[in-house]
């Protein structure tokens, strides 16, 4: 699959989707995007900047949701133009798709909406690549149905059907907790879509602070190493200059100052794993019969 001018897949280096959870200000967006571009350029990692103009699924109705679509898209367009990086943002309603697709390079669907057929179809018919997040309630093999819906819709519109990614972001484990089953990354490859691992939402504790979500950012390096060792096409990470002051998802955000050292380790591991290949491709019962 070609994405934003670079090739993605298990036979290619991982690409990175990264940025603050929500757009807090234009200057912070520009500064963060510029720093991430410098890091990824030095390390040779293809990079897409992400940030949300609206967080429509906050725990509390009193929590900061964002700057709104009009202002948010204006800032993302400025980041794209000024910093020279492709940009991604998420949409939550069908009527947001057209104006957002006119600005960004990649759309993203929230995990909670992965079963909403009309929404997935509308996103697929936008003409943009779509990062489709797997619901916290969904089995990994069920993502094949979601990707198939997107592909069918794209073909019906006369659009390419190979522009969709399947993103793992953890699965609910009791109340206010998520776990990551690394088998799901291999299972989701059966969709035929590039698999992305969301390393920061996977350590989220949904609603764990009462009116907001908690998180365990100390496990981001652990799970991201595990995902890269399993084999993924891309990584998704939210990062912030000062997570303690972040207006959304600070507890699970990677401090911007730590991104380079984390990505350096992951880049080395990714190179090693992909050079060795993936035994599981022919390790099942049929191959052993």
Swiss-Prot record:
Subcellular location: Cytoplasm
Top-rank EC class of the record's enzyme: transferase
GO-annotated biological processes: keto-3-deoxy-D-manno-octulosonic acid biosynthetic process
Record-listed E.C. numbers: 2.5.1.55
Keywords, in A-Z order: Cytoplasm, Lipopolysaccharide biosynthesis, Transferase
A Pfam short name: DAHP_synth_1
Reaction equation(s) it catalyzes: D-arabinose 5-phosphate + phosphoenolpyruvate + H2O = 3-deoxy-alpha-D-manno-2-octulosonate-8-phosphate + phosphate
Any one GO molecular function term: 3-deoxy-8-phosphooctulonate synthase activity
Pathway(s) it belongs to: Carbohydrate biosynthesis; 3-deoxy-D-manno-octulosonate biosynthesis; 3-deoxy-D-manno-octulosonate from D-ribulose 5-phosphate: step 2/3; Bacterial outer membrane biogenesis; lipopolysaccharide biosynthesis
Keyword Transferase: yes
GO cellular component: cytoplasm
Family affiliation: Belongs to the KdsA family.
Protein name: 2-dehydro-3-deoxyphosphooctonate aldolase
Gene: kdsA
């Amino acid at each position: 699959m070609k994405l934003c001018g670079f090739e993605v897949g298990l036979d290619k280096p991982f690409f990175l989707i990264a940025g603050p959870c929500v757009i807090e200000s234009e200057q912070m967006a520009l500064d963060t995007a510029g720093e991430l571009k410098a890091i990824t350029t030095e390390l040779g990692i293809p990079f897409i900047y992400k940030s949300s103009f609206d967080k429509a699924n906050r725990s509390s109705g009193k929590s900061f949701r964002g700057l709104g679509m009009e202002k948010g898209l204006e800032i993302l367009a400025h980041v794209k133009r000024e910093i020279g990086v492709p940009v991604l943002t998420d949409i939550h309603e069908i009527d947001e798709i057209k104006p957002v697709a006119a600005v960004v390079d990649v759309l993203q669907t929230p995990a909670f909406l992965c079963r909403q057929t009309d929404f997935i179809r509308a996103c697929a018919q936008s003409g943009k690549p779509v990062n489709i997040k797997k619901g916290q309630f969904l089995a990994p093999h069920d993502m094949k149905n979601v990707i198939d819906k997107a592909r069918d819709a794209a073909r019906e519109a006369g659009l390419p059907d190979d522009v969709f990614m399947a993103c793992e972001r953890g699965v609910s484990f009791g109340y206010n907790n998520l776990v990551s089953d690394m088998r799901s990354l291999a299972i989701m490859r059966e969709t035929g879509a590039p698999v992305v691992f969301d390393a920061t939402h996977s350590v989220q504790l949904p609603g764990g602070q009462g009116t907001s979500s908690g998180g365990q950012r100390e496990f981001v390096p652990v799970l991201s190493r595990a995902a890269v060792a399993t084999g993924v096409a891309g990584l998704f990470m939210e990062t912030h200059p000062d997570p303690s002051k972040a207006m959304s998802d600070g507890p699970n955000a990677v401090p911007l100052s730590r991104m380079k050292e984390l990505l350096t380790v992951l880049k080395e591991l990714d190179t090693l794993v992909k050079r060795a290949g993936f035994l599981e491709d022919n390790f099942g019962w049929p191959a052993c019969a």
